[in-house]
Amino acid sequence: MSDEEHHFESKADAGASKTFPQQAGTIRKNGYIVIKGRPCKVVEVSTSKTGKHGHAKCHFVAIDIFNGKKLEDIVPSSHNCDVPHVNRTDYQLIDISEDGFVSLLTESGNTKDDLRLPTDENLLKQVKDGFQEGKDLVVSVMSAMGEEQINAVKDVGTKN
């Protein structure tokens, strides 16, 4: 054995699954679902009755939580669907780099420098304008299935 100590920053979830199974018939509006490999928020669910052949079916209409695209899927209500583990974390904005990355302060006092500015025009303007005006900004970062994106910004006052 060596005398060296190895310190690893926990960035990943130690091989934990990015999704969990849930029966299609139990997924409701405002819940989450994976459609075509994308994490989505359910905006509409309709269930058809059992027909002559087969199961009752659930028709899901959902919006991709990262790119806003509308996706649809039809699944037998007794079957399992993948549901993404969705996390939302607030970070304080420290800096915006020239190449479009943001520097964020985590709760543990470390910096997180691997996130790009948001692609949404309104949100991008809010973040950039607020930062240039010297406001103290807190951004909400949504993460699911290995992707992360800034999806909201809050002004918590001006810097002293």
From Swiss-Prot:
GO annotation, biological process: positive regulation of translational elongation; positive regulation of translational termination; translational elongation
Family recorded in the similarity comment: Belongs to the eIF-5A family.
Keyword set, alphabetical order: Hypusine, Initiation factor, Protein biosynthesis
SUPFAM superfamilies referenced in this protein's UniProt entry, alphabetically: Nucleic acid-binding proteins, Translation proteins SH3-like domain
SMART domains: eIF-5a
Function: Translation factor that promotes translation elongation and termination, particularly upon ribosome stalling at specific amino acid sequence contexts. Binds between the exit (E) and peptidyl (P) site of the ribosome and promotes rescue of stalled ribosome: specifically required for efficient translation of polyproline-containing peptides as well as other motifs that stall the ribosome. Acts as a ribosome quality control (RQC) cofactor by joining the RQC complex to facilitate peptidyl transfer during CAT tailing step.
Post-translational note: Lys-52 undergoes hypusination, a unique post-translational modification that consists in the addition of a butylamino group from spermidine to lysine side chain, leading to the formation of the unusual amino acid hypusine. eIF-5As are the only known proteins to undergo this modification, which is essential for their function.
Hypusine PTM positions: K52
Pfam families reported for this sequence: eIF-5a, IF5A-like_N
Protein name: Eukaryotic translation initiation factor 5A-2
InterPro entries attached to this UniProt entry: IF5A-like, IF5A-like_N, NA-bd_OB-fold, Rib_uL2_dom2, Trans_elong_IF5A_hypusine_site, Transl_elong_IF5A_C, Translation_prot_SH3-like_sf
Species of origin: Solanum lycopersicum (Tomato)
Comp. bias (Basic and acidic residues): 1-12
Region described as Disordered: spans on this chain: 1-21
Keyword Methyltransferase carried by entry: no
GO MF annotation: an example: ribosome binding
